[in-house]
Design a protein with these regions (language model features):
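Alpha-helical segment of the N-proximal tetratricopeptide repeat
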Residues: 4-35
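Helix-start (N-cap) detector for alpha-helical repeat units in TPR-like alpha-solenoids
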Residues: 5-7, 40-41, 57, 75-76, ...
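Residue at a conserved register position within TPR or TPR-like alpha-solenoid repeats
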Residues: 16, 50-51, 85, 119
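Structural signature of tandem alpha-helical TPR/SEL1-like repeats
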Residues: 18-28, 53-66, 88-100, 124-130
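Canonical tetratricopeptide repeat
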Residues: 45-46, 80, 114
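TPR/TPR-like (Sel1-like) alpha-helical repeat modules
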Residues: 86-139
Length: 154
């Protein structure tokens, strides 16, 4: 069956990708995407592998973007697109991809974690206290609210 062959190739490629063997993962991802051309996950992960192994940013972005357009409510597809952008050194685009993902797949905590990794945190209000100190936390919340009301970014 073509579907099981594609899934087997994808699974092998994903294992190699997660173990950081991107060059070995590439043929498996290509094969999976060839066998099942309209599968957004296969397309998206092929984009990630192309970006990490061959630095083909344009092709990788196109694959991931097409996958996102096919299934807008799947957080992993936004995470893959953001990874392609981040690998290419396009941090702002990665943040935009995560923000778009948060609009369509709000409940997925992985998007929030990825956003926190990509964005810079403000320093604690009282630098002589630990960031987790209750006073710093409350002052930080107040600062965040005040900046939202005033429209300030930093």
């Amino acid at each position: 069956m073509m579907d099981t062959d594609a899934f087997r190739e994808f699974k092998t490629g994903l294992t190699l990708l997660r173990d950081n063997y991107v060059d070995k993962a590439l043929p498996h991802m290509k094969k999976a995407a060839e066998l099942e051309r309209n599968n957004p996950y296969y397309m998206s992960y092929l984009g990630v592998v192309l970006a990490r192994s061959e630095k083909k940013w344009g092709e990788a972005e196109s694959l991931c973007d097409s996958a996102v357009r096919m299934k807008r409510n799947q957080a992993q597809l936004y995470l893959n697109l953001a990874e392609v952008y981040a690998t290419a050194g396009r941090k702002e685009d990665a943040v935009e991809a995560i923000q778009a993902g948060l609009k369509f797949a709000r409940k997925d905590v992985r998007l929030t974690i990825a956003m926190n990794k990509l964005t810079d945190r403000r320093p604690p209000v009282l630098t002589f206290l630990n960031r987790r100190h209750p006073i710093n936390r409350q002052l930080g919340i107040l600062r965040h609210r005040a900046m939202g009301v005033l429209g300030g970014q930093r």
